[in-house]
């Protein structure tokens, strides 16, 4: 992950965390949307060893999920990272604290789906998360309007950008939020597993 170009001062990097169980075209779709809308230089896919809000039942091994992400990352601007496993961080708030400390010269943006913004108050120390890096929210089918009315969005109303100003987000100091406009992807890891399109081994 720590290639020389990734450490260029001022580089704008989106962080997309997830189980990637498996990685799929939807991940690629939202990544390219965020790259374009936010003017990012890179997006790091942070493959989680174990999402604390998800059961490990039906979860493939970390190495298999990492390999799935590497296979799907068909864009040179995407960097698949195992840094959460190497850091031993369990919660997003700790991962972000470690990354911003290790790479203070990089302008990080946390990328999350509208469905996850709704759940954000259930995340560990979520108010510390929003104070650490700006957050970009990409649309998800059935959740986009609910996300705009969610408690987290309400708490961040005064620091929310218009979608037309989203490219400014990486330049801002947290807290800052932007909802991105764009086509929604209906693909999900759950539906792929339910169709039998993903083996746990």
Swiss-Prot record:
Catalytic activity: nicotinate beta-D-ribonucleotide + ATP + H(+) = deamido-NAD(+) + diphosphate
Family membership: Belongs to the NadD family.
Pfam families linked to this entry: CTP_transf_like (PF01467)
Domain of life, per lineage: Bacteria
Keywords: ATP-binding, NAD, Nucleotide-binding, Nucleotidyltransferase, Pyridine nucleotide biosynthesis, Transferase
Any one GO molecular-function label of the UniProt entry: nicotinate-nucleotide adenylyltransferase activity
Pathway as given in its UniProt record: Cofactor biosynthesis; NAD(+) biosynthesis; deamido-NAD(+) from nicotinate D-ribonucleotide: step 1/1
Segments for region (Disordered): 182-201
Protein name in the entry: Probable nicotinate-nucleotide adenylyltransferase
Protein's GO biological process: NAD biosynthetic process
Reported function: Catalyzes the reversible adenylation of nicotinate mononucleotide (NaMN) to nicotinic acid adenine dinucleotide (NaAD).
Disulphide-bridged cysteine pairs: none
InterPro entries per the UniProt record, alphabetical: Cyt_trans-like (IPR004821), NadD/NMNAT (IPR005248), Rossmann-like_a/b/a_fold (IPR014729)
């Amino acid at each position: 992950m720590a290639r020389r170009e990734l450490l260029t001062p001022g580089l704008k990097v989106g962080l997309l965390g997830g189980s990637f169980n498996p990685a799929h075209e939807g991940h690629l779709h939202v990544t390219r949307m965020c790259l374009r809308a936010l003017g990012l230089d890179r997006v790091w896919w942070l493959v989680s060893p174990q999402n604390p809000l998800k059961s490990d039942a039906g979860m493939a091994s970390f190495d298999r999920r990492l390999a799935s992400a590497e296979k799907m990352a068909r864009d040179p601007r995407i960097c698949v990272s195992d840094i959460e496993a190497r850091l031993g961080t369990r919660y997003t708030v700790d991962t972000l604290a470690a990354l911003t400390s290790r790479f203070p010269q990089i302008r990080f943006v946390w990328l999350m789906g509208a469905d996850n913004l709704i759940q954000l108050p259930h995340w560990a120390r979520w108010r510390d998360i929003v104070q650490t890096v700006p957050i970009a929210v990409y649309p998800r089918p059935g959740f986009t309007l609910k996300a705009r009315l969610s408690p987290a969005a309400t708490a961040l109303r005064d620091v929310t950008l218009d979608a037309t100003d989203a490219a400014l987000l990486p330049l801002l100091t947290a807290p800052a939020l932007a909802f991105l406009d764009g086509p929604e992807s209906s693909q999900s890891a759950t539906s792929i597993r339910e169709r039998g399109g993903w083996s746990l081994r």
